[in-house]
Amino acid sequence: MAIGIGVNTWVWESPFTAASVGLIAKAQAMGFDAVTIPVEEPAAIDARAVAGALRDTGLRVHVTGAFGPTRDLTHDESRFREESLAYLADTLVLCEAWGARLLVGPCYSAVGKRRHVPPEQREREWERAVRGLRRAGAMAADHGVTLAVEPLNRFETDLVNTAAQLVRLLRDVAHPAVKAHLDTFHMNIEEKDVAAAVELAGTELVYVDASESDRGTPGSGQVDWAGLARGLRAIGYGGDCVIESFTPACRTIAAAAAIWRPLAPSQDALAQDGLRFLRRLLA
């Protein structure tokens, strides 16, 4: 099956606002098949303008969530778990309005939550994530959307770091609208064998982030890209592979992703060179 190549607008800007809509046409002009729109604050986005730009370009669209301290399905306080679900509900409305079939990201917990905790607490938090994702999956299904759940590296979460942990989580959730999302940046840190990790996710895998070992241009660093391609071919993956990177010019997201310097001659160069590399890799 043909694999499409997409780009996340985080490459250029954060947050995505009414002023960011032109990035959709930019992605099309560069030759991408799909665009991923981060919804950091749903109210900041001109939903109609986005829908119009998507209609005009014909690009496939995905949506990624942003999960800060108050958007945490594992939190001890139920009000924060409910806040996370309320945010997902608002974001799912946008997904449906735009025709996005996937809402992707680490939606089980707050990014940056990493601690040594007793096994009993870890298990409680795991069960909260399972219950929360079941509820979120039901909400997503009502909008014709699938949640694609992403493991993060050990420096960004203490709950789900590997494909094996993700597969266990999906089995526990056991909801048809909750599937797998893998990111090469995190895999490069946590997986011993990229191809094997992809194969373990198997047909549950519906979304892939292409991000270099330093978050720079795909193909310029240490990620096992050949292993990724082998794994995707082995499972017959037919979804999109989406370039994800960040710019140090956007201080909030740069601080969250620890981006302290430029990672390419320009963000446009990162996108264009990454697109060429991925076209060759996944042809």
Q: How should each PLM-predicted stretch be described?
A:
Residues 1-5, 31-34, 55-62, 97-102, ...:
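Short, well-ordered coil/turn segments that N-cap beta-strands
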Residues 1-10, 63-75, 107-117:
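N-terminal small/glycine-rich loop or linker at the start of catalytic domains
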Residues 11-13, 39-41, 67-69, 109-111, ...:
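Active-site-proximal loop/turn and secondary-structure-junction residues that shape catalytic pockets
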Residues 21-41, 91, 97-99:
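Catalytic domains of carbohydrate-active enzymes, especially glycoside hydrolases
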Residues 55-56, 79-179, 261, 265-269:
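Active-site acidic/histidine proton-transfer and metal-coordination neighborhood
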Residues 70-75, 111-116, 156, 189, ...:
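A short acidic, helix-capping loop that chelates divalent metal ions and anchors anionic groups
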